[in-house]
Amino acid sequence: ASFQZAPPGBAKAGEKIFKTKCAQCHTVEKGAGHKQGPNLNGLFGRQSGTTPGYSYSAANKNMAVNWGENTLYDYLLNPKKYIPGTKMVFPGLKKPQDRADLIAYLKZSTA
């Protein structure tokens, strides 16, 4: 199922998902440093593997995904299937609502 078929995202619910499942490895604030994963500020419209100062896997650089609602929705279902060889150990969010909520939060928090 594509992002167009996803339920409407709730940014507040997405923030909770980010804090429990993503924040140990990622930051969203402008100017915040990288953790185990890259800072996600400015994520939408950026190509995968291009955040300055972060050491990406060759897989992330070579995949050249342009991050947006559709690509994030597919990626967050199963990151290792979407980008084989990614360093991201997160298994993914299986529920469409969880992915839609997280994307709604990321759109607000990384802009």
Curated annotation (Swiss-Prot):
Q: Which Gene3D superfamilies match?
A: Cytochrome c-like domain (1.10.760.10)
Q: Which UniProt keywords apply?
A: Acetylation, Electron transport, Heme, Iron, Metal-binding, Methylation, Mitochondrion, Respiratory chain, Transport
Tell me where it resides. Mitochondrion intermembrane space
Keyword set includes Acetylation: yes
According to the UniProt entry, its GO molecular function terms are: electron transfer activity; heme binding; metal ion binding
Q: Please name the PROSITE patterns in this protein's record.
A: CYTC
Keyword hit for rRNA-binding = no
Q: Which residues carry this modification: N6,N6,N6-trimethyllysine?
A: 80, 94
Q: Where does the record place the modification N-acetylalanine?
A: 1
PTMs? Binds 1 heme c group covalently per subunit.
* Major site of localization recorded for this protein: mitochondrion
Alphabetized InterPro entries for the sequence: Cyt_c-like_dom, Cyt_c-like_dom_sf, Cyt_c_1A/1B
Q: Which residues of the sequence carry a binding annotation for heme c?
A: 22, 25-26, 88
Q: Which GO terms describe its cellular component?
A: mitochondrial intermembrane space
Tell me the protein family, please: Belongs to the cytochrome c family.
State what this protein does.
Electron carrier protein. The oxidized form of the cytochrome c heme group can accept an electron from the heme group of the cytochrome c1 subunit of cytochrome reductase. Cytochrome c then transfers this electron to the cytochrome oxidase complex, the final protein carrier in the mitochondrial electron-transport chain.
What name is this protein filed under? Answer: Cytochrome c
Please spell out the taxonomic lineage of the organism that makes this protein: Eukaryota, Viridiplantae, Streptophyta, Embryophyta, Tracheophyta
